Every structure is written in C-alpha cells, then in structure tokens.
C-alpha cells in the first residue's frame, strides 16, 4: 500500500497570469486536507526557452503538473517531458475547449491570455472596486443609488470581504455596520435601487472571530462586551429585527465561505428578490 504523502509539489504552468490554474489547483488540493500542496507558479510562459527552465525545476522537485498553454508545441513538450520524468501532467482547459469545439463546430482561436483582454467587463470590475472602497464601513455619499447591493450587519459578519469579492465580479457593493444604540443612516432607508441584504451568524461564531481580531472603530463597545456572547446575541436580535422590519433578505454566514455568501447575494440579485427571508 502506498504511504499517504504529508506534502506534495504542485507545478502550475501558464501562458497568462495563472489565476485559472491556481483556482483549479487549490480547489482540488483542498480535498486532501492531510497533504499540503507546495505551489510552484510559472506565469507568462510563452517560449520554449522559458519552458525548458521551468521543466528543470520540475525535474528537481517532481510533483503534479497542471498547465494552461494554448501553443500546441509547448503543450506537447510539457506532456512529453513530464512522461519522461514520470510525473503526471494535465491540460486544465483542453477538455473544456474540446467540448466547446464539438458543440460549436469550430476550433478555438488559441490566443494566450485571451481572457484578460482590457474590455468593458474589465473596466466594470475596476469601477466596482473603486466604488466599494468609497462606500466601505458605513460611508454613504449621495451616489448611493448607484450601488447594486448594500450589505448590512453587525461587526465581524464578513461585510467588507464579501463586498470586495462582489466588486471583483463587477458588482457595486456598499456596506454599513449595524451597531446597537447607534442610529442607522437615514439615506439607507431612502435607497430605492440597491438590493439591501443583512448578514448574520451565530453568537458563538462571531465571538470567536472577535476574540482573534481587534475591536476596530466601534467606540461604544468595550472589549468585554464586544466578545460577550450575550451582548452579541442582543446585537444579532437588533440586526434581524431591523432587516425583517424593512423586508431585507438575511443570509446566515456562520458556515459559509466568502465565495458562498457572495454567490447567495448574486442569486438574490438575479432573482430580483427583495422580500424578507433567512437563508
């Protein structure tokens, strides 16, 4: 029986930025919690000379090789060299491209970094990121109607990270902290266009996070109250009541990753759902 590895080398070769590979590699590696992946990322590999140098590194530290290289000659070199070294190599996009070709009845153009063209979508994401930075942590200037979504919640419910993730998807997101005893900005209630959604979690989960992170800009709470579960439960009750009173959807983030929370918000946006609910 093969002894389980405590770590392994993961080589990622790309003719672009390597983001696609990194996401795919980490998604797969996450399924093997007992084996740590040592990542070797090689972006912008577009010549045989560059590739040969990469292959030398793989030979020195053998491991799984994933690649996204549109040049068929370079792809063949990777596969042949890896076979000679006795390490597995996988073209991550090839099965997808083959499916597209079969369905569309036409071959791909095979342009390196085609997904990173500076198009309208790229500039939309940049605009959304700028918007998020200007509307973080309760900053609500007069252009709040330009927001696609406004996230509300008590401290440490992942409002800012979720806003950043949404901005990277081109969604203009603002976020507002809900603090017991401090009035919510009136401009929030007047907003007509944006979807307003509340984030909550269990008191236990929030207490755990708060104990490991600084108090931040909440002068009305001392450290003891900030991490006390009873006090947190009161904050959560206030937040839930506020959301229910105004018909804002509620998402429990206790067991959700940032990506999963953002996906839930995107689903609400797609469905145009602004009815009060808890999910």
Curated annotation (Swiss-Prot):
Described function: Bifunctional serine/threonine kinase and phosphorylase involved in the regulation of the pyruvate, phosphate dikinase (PPDK) by catalyzing its phosphorylation/dephosphorylation.
Chain residues that bind ADP: 153-160
GO molecular function per UniProt: ADP binding; ATP binding; phosphotransferase activity, phosphate group as acceptor; protein serine/threonine kinase activity
Pfam families given in the database record: Kinase-PPPase
Cross-referenced NCBIfam families: PRK05339.1 (NF003742)
Family assignment from sequence similarity: Belongs to the pyruvate, phosphate/water dikinase regulatory protein family. PDRP subfamily.
Alphabetic keyword roster: Kinase, Nucleotide-binding, Serine/threonine-protein kinase, Transferase
Top EC class of this enzyme: transferase
E.C. numbers: 2.7.11.32, 2.7.4.27
Catalysed reaction, written as an equation: N(tele)-phospho-L-histidyl/L-threonyl-[pyruvate, phosphate dikinase] + ADP = N(tele)-phospho-L-histidyl/O-phospho-L-threonyl-[pyruvate, phosphate dikinase] + AMP + H(+); N(tele)-phospho-L-histidyl/O-phospho-L-threonyl-[pyruvate, phosphate dikinase] + phosphate + H(+) = N(tele)-phospho-L-histidyl/L-threonyl-[pyruvate, phosphate dikinase] + diphosphate
Name of the molecule in the record: Putative pyruvate, phosphate dikinase regulatory protein
């Amino acid at each position: 029986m093969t002894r389980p590895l405590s770590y392994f080398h993961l080589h990622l070769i790309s003719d672009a930025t390597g983001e696609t590979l990194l996401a795919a590699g980490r998604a797969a590696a996450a399924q093997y919690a007992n084996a740590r992946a040592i990542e070797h990322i090689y972006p912008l590999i577009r010549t045989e000379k560059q590739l040969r140098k990469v292959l030398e590194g793989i030979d020195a530290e053998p491991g799984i090789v994933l690649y996204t290289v549109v040049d068929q000659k370079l792809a063949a070199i990777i596969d042949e060299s890896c076979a000679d070294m006795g390490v597995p190599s996988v073209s991550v996009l090839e099965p997808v491209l083959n499916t597209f070709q079969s369905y569309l009845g036409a071959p791909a153009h095979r342009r390196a970094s085609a997904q990173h063209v500076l198009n309208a979508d790229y500039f939309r994401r940049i605009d959304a990121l700028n918007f998020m930075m200007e509307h973080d942590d309760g900053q609500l200037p007069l252009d709040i109607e330009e927001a696609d979504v406004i996230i509300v919640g008590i401290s440490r419910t992942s409002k800012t990270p979720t806003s950043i993730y949404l901005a990277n998807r081109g969604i203009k997101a603002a976020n507002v902290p809900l603090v017991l005893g401090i009035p919510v900005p009136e401009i929030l209630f007047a907003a007509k266009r944006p979807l307003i959604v509340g984030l909550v979690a269990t008191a236990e989960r929030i207490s755990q996070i708060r104990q490991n992170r600084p108090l931040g800009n909440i002068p009305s709470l001392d450290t003891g109250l900030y991490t006390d579960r009873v006090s947190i439960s009161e904050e959560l009750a206030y937040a839930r009541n506020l959301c229910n009173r105004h018909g804002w959807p509620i998402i429990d983030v206790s067991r959700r990753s940032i990506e999963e929370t953002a996906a839930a918000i995107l689903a609400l946006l797609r469905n145009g759902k602004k009815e009060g609910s808890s999910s």
